[in-house]
Amino acid sequence: MVVDPAGGRAPEAVTIRLLGEVGAAVDGRVVPVLATPRMSRLVARLTLAADGWVPREQLARELWPDSDAAQARTNLRKLLHGLRRSIPGPPDVVDVAGPRVRWSGCPAVRVDVVAFRDALAHGDPAAAIGSYGGELLPGCDDEWVVAERERLRHQAVEALVRLADAAAAGGRDAEVVGHTRRLLEIEPLHE
């Protein structure tokens, strides 16, 4: 157990879902961490950043494209503060270094999309599919979200094809059927 220096108890586990039904839980209790679409997009953008760090100016523009630069920066500062407050206890879920921000990668905070990508990177398609709850941020039509959603969907389909092929090669027909059904849920027109 991590102890919050302010005297409270830090959470044992924080789970954030960005794939499928968006939501969050702290120690198994549902919490409104992702109560707004912008908060969900912020967490997704930070956790999916290729090199980890994202320029603050870029985040501000992406999240508030219709606001002037000063207002967008102010809004981002408030949103980052809200994110930090919504997940209790140390360590902080975001790192800020001057003009850059990144997701801290704290082991107590599990993000489904990070678990999905990590499992694929480690050659574990079964674990990846276990983390894939559906489309990234359903209903969000930001260009970067749509592109990332398609990329993740394609990776999930490839993982399911590998699992189905391995099950077929091993004569595990029930597994083949299960993987094929899941594949068709994700990609109904897949052949």
Where are these regions (language model features)?
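Intrinsically disordered, charged and Pro/Gly-enriched terminal/linker segments
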Residues: 1, 5-9, 29-39, 45-52, ...
